[in-house]
Amino acid sequence: MIRTDAKDGALVLFSGGQDSATCVAWALERYQTVETLGFDYGQRHRVELECREGVRDALKRRFPQWSHKLGDDHLIDLSVLGSISDTAMTRAIEIETASNGLPNTFVPGRNLLFMTIAAAIAYRRGLRALVGGMCETDFSGYPDCRDDTMKALQVALNLGMDTRFVLETPLMWLDKADTWRLAEQLGGAPLVELIRVETHTCYVGERSELHDWGFGCGECPACKLRKRGYDAYLRGESVTEAPA
């Protein structure tokens, strides 16, 4: 029998980065209960996990309309993923494009595993929506960020758990400039500033210098994309080309 007793709540995949923080705000605007979930999988930029608590605390302090909705946080040790992955996200190697055309920051199976674990937790917690920051427009080309992948995964999870999860991907068709705009629409300039200062995107974990667009090395693909998105957002434009 299909489980139908899930409450009006969401579990958000929350890494501590720009996209997932925007998704937390998006969920807080729509659901009565929002819980967050992070994973420690041996990522080089583990500093992003250290940003999670600061982002959550800032959301509670600066947005009283959301504070009562923000529920428990869950952090899962997924070091096994790092141990079986040979990528620039989990190894101190140069970031480059692999022979298959994907950047070597791609961690095979990562989002599939993240969403499956999220579904298991949401099932136990009685939450219906699973929210992730996957998108097809940030030029990385990760196959586990594609809309088709998420739709297929929703079907598989619902069949496998005999329930009615909804996988929400509010950033799926947004570029980085649009993501900044969404933050402004959700929480105005205060949310944009919170995300600029409190979140982390840099692949190499650099957090010693605050740029106009946030902390980072300024040279890795993630930093370049975040900067281009922020600059385009300020100009009222879109990001139309991949970072050089």
UniProtKB/Swiss-Prot annotation:
Q: What class of enzyme is it?
A: ligase
Required co-factor(s) are: Zn(2+)
Q: In which pathway does it act?
A: Purine metabolism; 7-cyano-7-deazaguanine biosynthesis
Provide the residue positions that the database annotates as binding Zn(2+). 202, 217, 220, 223
Co-factor note (free text)? Binds 1 zinc ion per subunit.
Q: What is its EC number?
A: 6.3.4.20
Q: Does the keyword Cell division apply?
A: no
Q: Which domain of life is it from?
A: Bacteria
The question of whether ATP-binding is a record keyword is answered with yes
Q: Which InterPro entries has this protein been placed in?
A: QueC, Rossmann-like_a/b/a_fold
- The regions listed as transmembrane in this protein's record are none
**Keyword list, A-Z:** ATP-binding, Ligase, Metal-binding, Nucleotide-binding, Queuosine biosynthesis, Zinc
GO biological process annotations for this chain's record?
A: queuosine biosynthetic process
Reactions catalysed, semicolon-separated, are: 7-carboxy-7-deazaguanine + NH4(+) + ATP = 7-cyano-7-deazaguanine + ADP + phosphate + H2O + H(+)
Question: What one GO molecular function would you report for this record?
Answer: ATP binding
Amino-acid positions noted as binding ATP in the UniProt annotation, renumbered to this chain: 14-24
What function does this protein fulfil?
Catalyzes the ATP-dependent conversion of 7-carboxy-7-deazaguanine (CDG) to 7-cyano-7-deazaguanine (preQ(0)).
> What HAMAP family is this protein classified in?
QueC
Q: Could you say which protein family the record assigns here?
A: Belongs to the QueC family.
Q: What protein does this entry describe?
A: 7-cyano-7-deazaguanine synthase
Q: Which organism is it from?
A: Burkholderia mallei (strain ATCC 23344)
